[in-house]
Amino acid sequence: MEWLYSLFIEHSALQAVVVLSLISAIGLGLGKIHVCGISLGVTFVFFAGILAGHFGLSIDPQMLNYAESFGLIIFVYALGLQVGPGFFSSFRKGGVTLNMLAIAVVILGTFLAVVCSYTTGVSLPNMVGILCGATTNTPALGAAQQTLKQMGLESSTPALGCAVAYPLGVIGVILAVLLIRKLLVRREDLEVQEKDDANKTYIAAFQVHNPAIFNKSIKDIAHMSYPKFVISRLWRDGNVSIPTSEKIIKEGDRLLVVTSEKDALALTVLFGEQENTDWNKEDIDWNAIDSQLISQRIVVTRPELNGKKLGALRLRNHYGINISRVYRSGVQLLATPELTLQLGDRLTVVGEAAAIQNVEKVLGNAIKSLKEPNLVAVFVGIILGLALGAVPFSIPGISTPVRLGLAGGPIIVGILIGTFGPRLHMITYTTRSANLMLRALGLSLYLACLGLDAGAHFFDTVFRPEGLLWIGLGFGLTLVPTVLVGFFAFKIMKIDFGSVSGMLCGSMANPMALNYANDTIPGDNPSVAYATVYPLSMFLRVIIAQVLLMFLL
């Protein structure tokens, strides 16, 4: 039986791998069980870790710290990499509003924590720990402990408060999302949102009556116009054609245009007249040319095209084809000449069969090559993220510098590389399954270590009178701000439920609740909203944990 002892009990690298794998496997297995329609998924790994720690299972502290940190880093970086392409565009679609709402969650929770500390007699260091647990924010806990050390005070007291409040901190956000869904969200809300996400482009028909564009090429007209558009068909003298950018537009031409719905009015002013909403008019057969054409979706797989402008390829002029749409990470984009291509983009190409074959050679369309992992961007991003997280930021009035830490730095760099990497010709593409695998692996490691560390003293603290008080306070600090702000965001501000859920999860730094939201809400809105508010929320949480101790102790 000595080999069993060395495998499960005696501290070693092998024992650490076995214990963490066992906790993760049990937690993930139990996480698939549905109770009242709810399953905790990967979150159950945390509770499996607590149980293992309670029964005396442990691993080497340095191994524990390494695995916990590395798991968190992998998770947040992969998340940033996934949502990066849609992150900055989200600021034009309500991202500022989402961040303001997230700040409201942070401020409301902090205010309640200070009030509870003075009214219940719980010491401020313990209350800061409870607040960190209620918001599932271990970087803030680390910042608070570092501040206490620098002030010459006991630094271990907040950790137990965090561990006691953490489980209901995880569940509290899930309950808030579930409560808002049950009370306010209709099935049609989710269906409409799913439909809207799949149709971001708009097809309209116009007739040319504006003298300012008579006898001008499509390229010249595009340079004159702010709204972006693609002319996919041109009807002239009873014939339909696919125009190139050099095609001259004449009075009376009828155009089938792909644009965004909000730009349709501006294009009506540009061209002169918008046709009936139903662009399939009886007097025009826009599909007449289709007997000679085929439509095919081609994937960009040639690395040298990564970061190039679509217009620089001059595909329409060289091959007489039309690119109507581009799909990227599940988002439908307008195929404008200024669009920067990324590896993995899927282009809808319309043209003759021979021309499409030539375009296929230009773009690559070798889907198998995309399955090869691009790990350089992952490791470079992690290094840069950790470097950013270690940079001290001096805040006026605070003696201790503030740092973004292991979570804040990598997610910001992940977002930046996911967004701007292709423009620097850095290959950042990963398949959705590979990204999900990285995130799930990182989160499982992080939660297993967190639970194992908290489990040793968890039940002893919980069943003491002050432990029950801490649990109640932590649950209140989780539930009250999220429900109030979530209700306001969905009911008053009319923000879609997916974005509200992601905002609440991000403002509470709760990746486990995000995992639940992603499993139950269609589309990527929860992940995009989470990444939109997470960096600022994390930064504020870390600052506030230090500010409270410095100014109120």
Swiss-Prot record:
Q: Which Pfam families match?
A: Asp-Al_Ex, TrkA_C
Keyword set, alphabetical order: Cell membrane, Membrane, Repeat, Transmembrane, Transmembrane helix, Transport
Listed GO CC annotations: plasma membrane
Using the record's annotation, list all stretches that form the RCK C-terminal domain: 190-273, 281-365
Its Gene Ontology molecular function terms? monoatomic cation transmembrane transporter activity
Q: Where in the cell is it found?
A: Cell membrane
Task: Give the main localization category.
Answer: membrane
Q: Which Gene3D superfamilies match?
A: Regulator of K+ conductance, C-terminal domain
| Gene Ontology BP annotations | potassium ion transport
Question: Where do the TM regions start and end?
Answer: 13-30, 37-59, 69-91, 98-120, 157-179, 375-397, 402-424, 436-458, 468-490, 497-514, 529-551
Q: How does it sit in the membrane?
A: Multi-pass membrane protein
Top-level taxon in the UniProt lineage: Bacteria
Q: Which family does it belong to?
A: Belongs to the AAE transporter (TC 2.A.81) family.
The protein's name is Uncharacterized transporter BF1818
